[in-house]
Amino acid sequence: MAEKVAVLLGGTSAEREVSLLSGQAVLAGLREAGIDAHPVDTKDFPVTQLKEAGFEKVFIALHGRGGEDGTLQGVLEFLQLPYTGSGVMASALSMDKLRTKQVWQGIGLTVSPYVSINSQQVERLTDSQLQEYVADLGLPLIVKPSLEGSSVGMTKVNEISELRGALEAAFRYDVDLLVEKWLHGPEYTVAILGDTALPSIRIQPAAVFYDYDAKYWSEETQYFCPSGLSDEKEQQLAELALKAYQSVGCSGWGRVDVMMDTDGDFYLLEVNTSPGMTSHSLVPMAARQAGLSFSQLVVKILELAD
């Protein structure tokens, strides 16, 4: 008898809309391959009842808090249900951009220069301290919450007068923030399937930066796969992405985002343990370049579940 698979989608995070799209796409891909897959919106159905409902395996298509931060993974471990993607520790760590960066720095991987600020500090931040950050990092800057994905809560800061407002906007989403140097150069992403880096993708948003709308709704964002890198640079990027992915304990599948500066050097941004699987998403694009259809991709991800 075929395994009954739950495709977890929707949920309650800031990325609910995207998760619904990802989940429906995954569901269609699994069913195309003859898999007995069913949609489960965790907003309406208690995850603790999955086993009682006869499910034997879980495909996680949730994004953001409660879905890719280790919380859900811990529940599924307790229920002894195999699930896709990274485990508890890697999911929790990867969701936290600040602590992920600290791990990468600790093993000598390159990250974009940054300072971290928490909500207790911000009330005491003087204008002179803000000026110090700007002096250290230069303008423009990018301000982002540590614990949100899909560019939620991010703001580009072009003038020092905009910095305090950007911090306040980001604090609506998290108590820890990153203020990063703005890197002038292309953004790349590397999808990882098992222990293999798929062909890199170069991202060219029409807007100022690759924000939530550019990722999921814009028809003007351009993606290049192959990315146009030389064979040597492609290999260098693949090795960096794999090392970054494995160093925080990721497994199954994921995606590593990287910037290149004007000198051609790569800087790690973040790792995503439950990437989007919508029509605009990047992992399916990289998989196509590697010869995998969408249905073959989701079946492979499911096979890697443990």
Curated annotation (Swiss-Prot):
ATP-grasp domain location: 101-303
Residues that, per the record, bind Mg(2+) 2: E270, N272
UniProt KW rRNA processing keyword: no
Localization: Cytoplasm
Domain of life of the native organism: Bacteria
Alphabetic keyword roster: ATP-binding, Cell shape, Cell wall biogenesis/degradation, Cytoplasm, Ligase, Magnesium, Manganese, Metal-binding, Nucleotide-binding, Peptidoglycan synthesis
Residue positions binding ATP: 134-189
Enzyme class: ligase
UniProt keyword tRNA-binding, yes or no: no
Cofactor mode of binding and number, as noted: Binds 2 magnesium or manganese ions per subunit.
PROSITE patterns given in the database record: ATP_GRASP (PS50975), DALA_DALA_LIGASE_1 (PS00843), DALA_DALA_LIGASE_2 (PS00844)
Main location: cytoplasm
InterPro entries: ATP-grasp, ATP_grasp_subdomain_1, D-Ala_lig_Van_CS, D_ala_D_ala, Dala_Dala_lig_C, Dala_Dala_lig_N, PreATP-grasp_dom_sf
GO CC annotation terms, alphabetical: cytosol
Single biological process term from Gene Ontology: regulation of cell shape
Reaction catalyzed: 2 D-alanine + ATP = D-alanyl-D-alanine + ADP + phosphate + H(+)
Cofactor dependency: Mg(2+); Mn(2+)
Function: Cell wall formation.
Similarity annotation: Belongs to the D-alanine--D-alanine ligase family.
Protein name (record): D-alanine--D-alanine ligase
The encoding gene: ddl
